[in-house]
C-alpha cells in the first residue's frame, strides 16, 4: 500500500515546488481521504499553509491529534500567524497549566527542527512581554544553528547585545552537522553500472522515487544527503576524476602543463574570483591557498595523503573541472529549496574511448552544497519503505545518459589545501606521505566525503565571517551607534553592500543622525537597484517629508500603494505625502489604514500620533503613542511624542521623564538632549539645562535647534555676550531663519544698542512678512524668559516682544528651524 501512496505524494510535492497550490491541495485532500495517516495530515496542512490559508491548516490540525513534532510545529506556527499566542505556547512548551518543557526537552523532541521551534517560542515570549525568556530561546536557537539571522535580529531589537563573534561561528563539527543533517555520516557507495548509464547519485524527491528505485542509486544506509532542501551552487560536470582528489601538501604529481598553469581561484558562482583571501565570502572554491604561510582558509583540508584510483592503461580519460553551472551572484547556502536544477555529485569516474563494459565509480552521495538555513527535513519518511525514501524539495533525476564532457586542461594547485590533478599513470599512484605519518609507518586515506565536508565547512566559514560583519553593523544600528554602523556596513564586499537590505540599514542610520540629504541619496539608490523593495520605505518617505520634497514623496507613495496595498509602509508613505501638503485629515486616514493592515506596526501609530498633535487632538495623540509603546517598548519616537504632549500641557516633570526614557533607548540623539534641556530650563534648572544642551552640541555641533535653545537659555540667564556669540554662529547655519534675527534683536536691546536691535527686527520682519512664526511665539512659555517693560519699536511690538524666543517644538513646520526639530524623527 505504501508503494501506491508514493506517486501521489510525489505529485503533491512537485506541485508545491512549482507553486501549483490548488493542484497540491486537491491531491493532498484525495490522499488524506484515502489514508488517514499522520504523514498525510501533515502534507495536507502544509499545502493549506503554503497556499496562504493558515486558518485552514490550523483547524485541520486542531481537529486531529498532533503527535509528531512536524505537525506540532506547523500548528504552533499557524497559531502565531493567527495571533493565538497562548495556544501556540501551549503546543510547543506546555503552557502555564502544564509542566513547561525545558530547552533540552525541546531539542530532544524536535531534533533538527529545534532551532526553529525555539525561535518561534522566543517570538511568542517577546510578544507577551517576557523578554528574558524570549532572549534565552533566541540564544539557544542560535547556538543550535548559527546560520539563522532572524533570532539575532530579534535579540538586537529587544535591546540585547549579542556578540556576533560568539554567535556566528561553527564551534565544533557537531555544531556544523546539526545544521546539515547527516552531512558526514553518508557513506560512499560503489556501483557497477553499465557503459553510458548515469554515474550520479541524486537526492530523490517524492516524484523521483520510482525512477530511483529502478536505477537503484540510493545508498541503502543513507537517510539524507547534503542537499536537504536546496540545490544552490553545484558542480555541473557531474564527475571529478580520481586524479581530482585533493592531495597532501607537496605531494602532487604534476604534468608540465599543470605546473606552468597560472595559479588562480575559481568562483563557485562561475568565473574567476575577484575577492581577496580576507574578503568574507562563502561562494568561492579556492584552487590555491592565499599564501604559502596561510593555510587557514582550508586548513586540514588535505593534511593526509589520498589514494588515487586511475583509469586502465591506455584509456584516455576525460577530465572534468569542478566549476559552477550557476551564474550571477547566487552562492552557497543562499537559495530556497524549490530550484529545479540537477543536483551535482562528486564521482570518481573514468571513461574509455573504446568499448567499456563496466566501471567502478566512487560515488559520493553528499554534495558540497546545502543550505543550513533551510528548514530541516522531516525526521522520518512520509511513507515507510525499505527500497526508497520520500523527501521534500529534492531534485529531480533527469539524466538518462551521462553528459559528454569535453577534454579540458586540468586546473592545478601546488600549495597546501588545494585541489591538484596529477597526470594519469598506468598504475595506482600513491602520493607522498606526511613526514609524521611516514615516521609512524601509518597510511591514512582521505575519503571523498571528508574532502567534501571540509570544502563545505570552508564555505560555511565564509558565510559566518560575512554574518559576523553584518551582525556587528546591525547591532550598532539597534544601539543607535549610527556612525559605527555606517562604517561597518560600508566596508562589506561591494556585491553585498549594493543590496537593498544593507543600503536600507545605512539609510536608516543617516536618518537617525538627521543627515537627511545623505539618507535620501542612499534610499534613492535602493529604489534604483530594488524597485520592488517595500521594507524601509517608510523611513524614506519621512526623509522626503523633512526635505519638503513633495513631488518625490508623491511618486514614492503612488508606486508603493500600487505595488502592495497590504503593506503598512505604503500607507505610511501616502500619509506622509498628504501631511506634507497639510491635508492632515486625509493623512490621518492613511495612517489609520496602515494600522489596519498591520496592527503591530509601531511606526504607523507614531506617525498618526504626530498628525493628531498637529490637529490639536492631544488625547487621541496620547492614545496613539501609548499603543506604539505597547507594540514596541523600545520605539523611542513614541516616548518622545508623549514627552512633547506633556510639555505642551505644561506638565514639565512628566515631559522630562518621557524624554529621558527616549534618551535611554537612543542616547546618541542630540534632538532628545535638546528637548530635555528645554524642559529642565522650564523647571528652573538652568545650569543643568546648559550642561544638557552642551552635550547635545558635542554630539551634533551644527544642530541649529540645539544652538538656538542654548542661546535662549543664555539670554534668560542674562549672559548676553555669550548668547550673541551663539546666535552669530547660528546665523551662519540658518541664514534665513527669522527667529534667529529676532532673538539677536532682543540681545542688542538688552545691551543698549538700539540701532542694531532695530536692524535685526527689520530683517526678521523681511524674512517673515506674514508673521508665520507668530504661532510659535504665541505658544512660548512666558516663564521661560523675563518680559520686557515696553516695546521699543513697532516691529518688535508686532513680533510680540513679550514672548520668549524658544521654539514650541511642534508648530510652524515651514521654517528651517522647525525642520530640524520635527515631530517625526
Swiss-Prot record:
One of its GO terms (biological process) is neuron projection development. Gene3D superfamilies: Tetratricopeptide repeat domain. Pathway: Protein modification; protein ubiquitination. Residues 396-414 have a biased composition (Basic residues). The modification Phosphoserine is found at residues 291, 339, 380, 387, 427, 436, 439, 822. GO terms for molecular function: protein phosphatase binding. Phosphorylated. Phosphorylation on Ser-427 and Thr-447 occurs specifically during mitosis. It is found in: Nucleus; Cytoplasm, Cytoskeleton, Spindle. Residues 306-423, 782-825 are annotated as: Disordered. Keywords: Cytoplasm, Cytoskeleton, Nucleus, Phosphoprotein, Repeat, TPR repeat, Ubl conjugation pathway. TPR repeats lie at residues 6-35, 38-65, 67-99, 115-145, 465-495, 499-528, 533-563, 567-598, 601-631, 635-667, 670-702, 704-734, 737-768. GO terms for cellular component: anaphase-promoting complex; centrosome; cytoplasm; mitotic spindle; nucleoplasm; nucleus; spindle. The modification Phosphothreonine is found at residues 205, 209, 313, 367, 431, 447. Residues 349-362 have a biased composition (Low complexity). Homodimer. The mammalian APC/C is composed at least of 14 distinct subunits ANAPC1, ANAPC2, CDC27/APC3, ANAPC4, ANAPC5, CDC16/APC6, ANAPC7, CDC23/APC8, ANAPC10, ANAPC11, CDC26/APC12, ANAPC13, ANAPC15 and ANAPC16 that assemble into a complex of at least 19 chains with a combined molecular mass of around 1.2 MDa; APC/C interacts with FZR1 and FBXO5. Interacts with RB. Interacts with FAM168B/MANI. Interacts with MCPH1. Belongs to the APC3/CDC27 family. Component of the anaphase promoting complex/cyclosome (APC/C), a cell cycle-regulated E3 ubiquitin ligase that controls progression through mitosis and the G1 phase of the cell cycle. The APC/C complex acts by mediating ubiquitination and subsequent degradation of target proteins: it mainly mediates the formation of 'Lys-11'-linked polyubiquitin chains and, to a lower extent, the formation of 'Lys-48'- and 'Lys-63'-linked polyubiquitin chains. The APC/C complex catalyzes assembly of branched 'Lys-11'-/'Lys-48'-linked branched ubiquitin chains on target proteins. This is Cell division cycle protein 27 homolog.
Amino acid at each position: 500500500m505504501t508503494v501506491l501512496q508514493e506517486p501521489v505524494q510525489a505529485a503533491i510535492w512537485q506541485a508545491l515546488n512549482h507553486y501549483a497550490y490548488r493542484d497540491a491541495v486537491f491531491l493532498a485532500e484525495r490522499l488524506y481521504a484515502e489514508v488517514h495517516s499522520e504523514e498525510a495530515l501533515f502534507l495536507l496542512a502544509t499545502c493549506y499553509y503554503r497556499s496562504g490559508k493558515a486558518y485552514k491548516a490550523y483547524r485541520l490540525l486542531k481537529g486531529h491529534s498532533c503527535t509528531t513534532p512536524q505537525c506540532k510545529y506547523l500548528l504552533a506556527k499557524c497559531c502565531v500567524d493567527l495571533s493565538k499566542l497562548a495556544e501556540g505556547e501551549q503546543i510547543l512548551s506546555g503552557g502555564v497549566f502544564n509542566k513547561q518543557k525545558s530547552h533540552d526537552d525541546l531539542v530532544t523532541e524536535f531534533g533538527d527542527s529545534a532551532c526553529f521551534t525555539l525561535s518561534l517560542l522566543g517570538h511568542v515570549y517577546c510578544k507577551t512581554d517576557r523578554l528574558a525568556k524570549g532572549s534565552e530561546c533566541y540564544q539557544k536557537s542560535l547556538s543550535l544553528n548559527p546560520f539563522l539571522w532572524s533570532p539575532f535580529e530579534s535579540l538586537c531589537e529587544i535591546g540585547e547585545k549579542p556578540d556576533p563573534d560568539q554567535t556566528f561561528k561553527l564551534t565544533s563539527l557537531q555544531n556544523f552537522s546539526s545544521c546539515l543533517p547527516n552531512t558526514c555520516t553518508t557513506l560512499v557507495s560503489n556501483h557497477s553500472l553499465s557503459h553510458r548509464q548515469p554515474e550520479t547519485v541524486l537526492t530523490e524527491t517524492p516524484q523521483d522515487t520510482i525512477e530511483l528505485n529502478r536505477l537503484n542509486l540510493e545508498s541503502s544506509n543513507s537517510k539524507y544527503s547534503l542537499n536537504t532542501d536546496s540545490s544552490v551552487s553545484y558542480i555541473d560536470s557531474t564527475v571529478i576524476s580520481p586524479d581530482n582528489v585533493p592531495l597532501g601538501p607537496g605531494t602532487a604529481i604534476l604534468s608540465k602543463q599543470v605546473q606552468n598553469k597560472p595559479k588562480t581561484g575559481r568562483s563557485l558562482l562561475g568565473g574567476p574570483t575577484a575577492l581577496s583571501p580576507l574578503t568574507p565570502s562563502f561562494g568561492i572554491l579556492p584552487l590555491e591557498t592565499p599564501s604559502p604561510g596561510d593555510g587557514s582558509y582550508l586548513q586540514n583540508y588535505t593534511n593526509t595523503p589520498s589514494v588515487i584510483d586511475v583509469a586502465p592503461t591506455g584509456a584516455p580519460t576525460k577530465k572534468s573541472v569542478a566549476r559552477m553551472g550557476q551564474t550571477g551572484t547566487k552562492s552557497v547556502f543562499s537559495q530556497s529549496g524549490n530550484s529545479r536544477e540537477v543536483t551535482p555529485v562528486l564521482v570518481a569516474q573514468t571513461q574509455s574511448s573504446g568499448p567499456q563494459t563496466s566501471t567502478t565509480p566512487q560515488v559520493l552521495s553528499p554534495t558540497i552544497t546545502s543550505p543550513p538555513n533551510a528548514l530541516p527535513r522531516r525526521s522520518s519518511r512520509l511513507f515507510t519503505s525499505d527500497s526508497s525514501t520520500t523527501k521534500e524539495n529534492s531534485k529531480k533525476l533527469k539524466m538518462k545518459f551521462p553528459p559528454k564532457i569535453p577534454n579540458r586542461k586540468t586546473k592545478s594547485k601546488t600549495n597546501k589545501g588545494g585541489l591538484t590533478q596529477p597526470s594519469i599513470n598506468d598504475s595506482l599512484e600513491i602520493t607522498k606521505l606526511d613526514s609524521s605519518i611516514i615516521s609512524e609507518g601509518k597510511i591514512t586515506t582521505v575519503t571523498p566525503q571528508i574532502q567534501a565536508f571540509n570544502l563545505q565547512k570552508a564555505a560555511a566559514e565564509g558565510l559566518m565571517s560575512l554574518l559576523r560583519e553584518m551582525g556587528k553593523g546591525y547591532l550598532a544600528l539597534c544601539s543607535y551607534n549610527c556612525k559605527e554602523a555606517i562604517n561597518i556596513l560600508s566596508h562589506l564586499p561591494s556585491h553585498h553592500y549594493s543590496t537593498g537590505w544593507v543600503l536600507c540599514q545605512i539609510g536608516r542610520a543617516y536618518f537617525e543622525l538627521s543627515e537627511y540629504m545623505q539618507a535620501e541619496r542612499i534610499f534613492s539608490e535602493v529604489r534604483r537597484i530594488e524597485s520592488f523593495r517595500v521594507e524601509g520605505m517608510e523611513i524614506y518617505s519621512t526623509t522626503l517629508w523633512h526635505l519638503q520634497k513633495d513631488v518625490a514623496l508623491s511618486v514614492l507613495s503612488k508606486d508603493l500603494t500600487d505595488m502592495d496595498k497590504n503593506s503598512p509602509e505604503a500607507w505610511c508613505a501616502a500619509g506622509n505625502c498628504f501631511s506634507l501638503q497639510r491635508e492632515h485629515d486625509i493623512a490621518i486616514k492613511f495612517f489609520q489604514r496602515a494600522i489596519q493592515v498591520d496592527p503591530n506596526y509601531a511606526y504607523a501609530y507614531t506617525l498618526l500620533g504626530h498628525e493628531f498633535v498637529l490637529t490639536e487632538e492631544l488625547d487621541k495623540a496620547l492614545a496613539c503613542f501609548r499603543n506604539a509603546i505597547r507594540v514596541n517598548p523600545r520605539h523611542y519616537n513614541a516616548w518622545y511624542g508623549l514627552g512633547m504632549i506633556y510639555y505642551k500641557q505644561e506638565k514639565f516633570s512628566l515631559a522630562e521623564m518621557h524624554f529621558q526614557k527616549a534618551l535611554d533607548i537612543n542616547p546618541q540623539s542630540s534632538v532628545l538632549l535638546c528637548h530635555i534641556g528645554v524642559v529642565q530650563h522650564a523647571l528652573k534648572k538652568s545650569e543643568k539645562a546648559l550642561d544638557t544642551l552642551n552635550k547635545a552640541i558635542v554630539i551634533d555641533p551644527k544642530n541649529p535647534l540645539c544652538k538656538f535653545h542654548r542661546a535662549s537659555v543664555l539670554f534668560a540667564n542674562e549672559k548676553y555676550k555669550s548668547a550673541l556669540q551663539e546666535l552669530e554662529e547660528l546665523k551662519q547655519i540658518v541664514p534665513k531663519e527669522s527667529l534667529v534675527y529676532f532673538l539677536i534683536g532682543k540681545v542688542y536691546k538688552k545691551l543698549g544698542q538700539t540701532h542694531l536691535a532695530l536692524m535685526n527686527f527689520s530683517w526678521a520682519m523681511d524674512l517673515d512678512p506674514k508673521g508665520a512664526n507668530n504661532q510659535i511665539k504665541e505658544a512660548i512659555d512666558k516663564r521661560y524668559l523675563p518680559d520686557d517693560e515696553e516695546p521699543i519699536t513697532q516691529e518688535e511690538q508686532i513680533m510680540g516682544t513679550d514672548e520668549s524666543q524658544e521654539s514650541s517644538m511642534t508648530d510652524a513646520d515651514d521654517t528651517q528651524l522647525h525642520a530640524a526639530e520635527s515631530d517625526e524623527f
